[in-house]
Amino acid sequence: MFQWYQRSLIQRPLLTQSLTTACLFAVGDSLAQQAVEKRGIAQHDVARTGRMAFYGGGNVQPFPYKLPLLTVVAVFGPLATKWFQVLQRRINLPSAQRTVVGRVAADQLLFAPTMIGVFLSSMSVLEGGSLSEKLERSYWPALKANWTVWPFLQLVNFALVPLQFRVLTVNVLNIGWNCFLSLSNNVGSQDVPLVA
C-alpha cells in the first residue's frame, strides 16, 4: 500500500496529496462529531463532514454541490503542497538548523495565520453564515491554539521528513487538529465549547 502511495506521489503529487487531505479532514470532523460531541450516527451532520473534506482537498460526496471529482482539489491540500515546495526552494540558510527554524517561522507567521482565516472564511461561505461573526468569534482562539501545537510539530516535520512526505505527515497529525478546527468552526452554531 505504501509503495502504491509513493508511486502516486511521484505520478500525481497534487491530486494524491489533495485527496489524502480531503479524507483526513473528513476523519477529523467525524472524530469531532462522534468522539467529542457524541452525536451518534443518526445525528451525524454529513454536510458538515462534506464541507470539511471539500476544504481539505477535494469533492468527497455527499456534498451539496455536484462537481466532478478530478476538477475540484479545493483549498488546503493543494496550497500546503505548493507551500512546502516554496519553503524548500526559498529558505536555505547557512546551517541546517537555521534553515529548519526559518521554515518553521515562515510557516507559523505567514501560512498558519492565513490558512486559519481561509478555513474559517471558507466554512462561513459554504455554510451561508456571517463571515465577520465567524472570524471575530473563532480566529484568535484557533490561531493561539495553533501556536501551542504546530511550531514543535513542524520543527520535527521540516527537520526529519523528506519533502514528498511532509503534507502526508501534516495530514496524519492534522486528524486531531482538524477535530479542533471543526469544533472551533461550529462554536456558536450549536452548543460546542471551544477549548484552546
Curated annotation (Swiss-Prot):
Coiled coil: none annotated. Disulfide bonds: none annotated. Signal peptide: none annotated. The chain crosses the membrane at residues 67-87, 109-129, 145-165. The keyword Transmembrane helix applies. The gene is sym1. Keywords: Membrane, Mitochondrion, Mitochondrion inner membrane, Transmembrane, Transmembrane helix. Its main location: mitochondrion. Belongs to the peroxisomal membrane protein PXMP2/4 family. This is Protein sym1. It is a multi-pass membrane protein. May be involved in cellular response to stress. Required to maintain mitochondrial DNA (mtDNA) integrity and stability. InterPro entries: Mpv17_PMP22. One of its GO terms (cellular component) is mitochondrion. It is found in: Mitochondrion inner membrane. The keyword Lyase does not apply. It comes from the Eukaryota.
